C-alpha cells in the first residue's frame, strides 16, 4: 500500500506571509481565498481513498467496507433478494465491481395501487474501479540482457506509455491461495517498489527527443532483477508474501503500481497529483 501523503496535504494552519510577517490560514489569504478548509479536507479524503486502492480489488474491498459501516446490507449475487422499502443494499461481482442502491420509502405511491408504474424514476452514478496500467502475464518472467530478468506484462486499458518510464513500481492485485480444501482470494500490495521500466541512455537512442514510440512488448517490460532472480522465482516471491508454499498459489491478477505519494500542490493548493 502507499504510505501516508506528505505533510503538505494539510497545509492550512500557519501559512507564512513574508510580506506581512505573520501567519495566516487559507481563508485569510486573499490570493488563496478560493481554496477553503472544506476543499482541502475533501482533497485529503480523496487522497486517502486513492492510496487505499492500488488495484480494482482493493477499491472494491474499500467501498464495501464503507458501505458496511454506513449500514448497507450485502446481497450475494447468487441468492434470492428480499428488498424492503427504504432499504440500502449492495452486491459485488468478481471482487472487483460493486453495485450499491437505495430503495424509496413509499413504493405503493411509486407503482400505484394497481401495480402500474406511476412516478417511477431513479438516479444512477457509475465509475471505474480500475485504471490503466500493466498486468503481469501468466508466464511472468522474461530473460533480459546479460543476467537481468524482466517482468512479462501486457498493457491494461488506455494509457500514456511514456509516463511509466523511470518510476520505481510496486505490485498490487489479488492472489488465489489454496488453504486445505478452500480457495481464498487474498489482496496483495507490496510495501516496496520491485520493478522499473528504464529509459535507454540518450547515446543509445539519439532520436528519443524527436519522437519515441515504444514497443510495449520490448521497451515496456519492467526490470525486476540484475541477476539475483531466475526464471520461475516470481511465484515463489509471491508465495513468500503470504507465507505459503509456491504450489498453494493457484492464480493471480497482479498489476504495476506507482507508489509515489499523492500530494496537494500549487501556489494556492488548488491541484492534486496522484
Where are these regions (language model features)?
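N-terminal hydrophobic/helix-forming segments and targeting peptides
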Residues: 3, 17-274
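Basic polycationic patches enriched in arginine
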Residues: 8-9, 32
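Short intrinsically disordered, low-complexity coil segments enriched in acidic
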Residues: 1-7
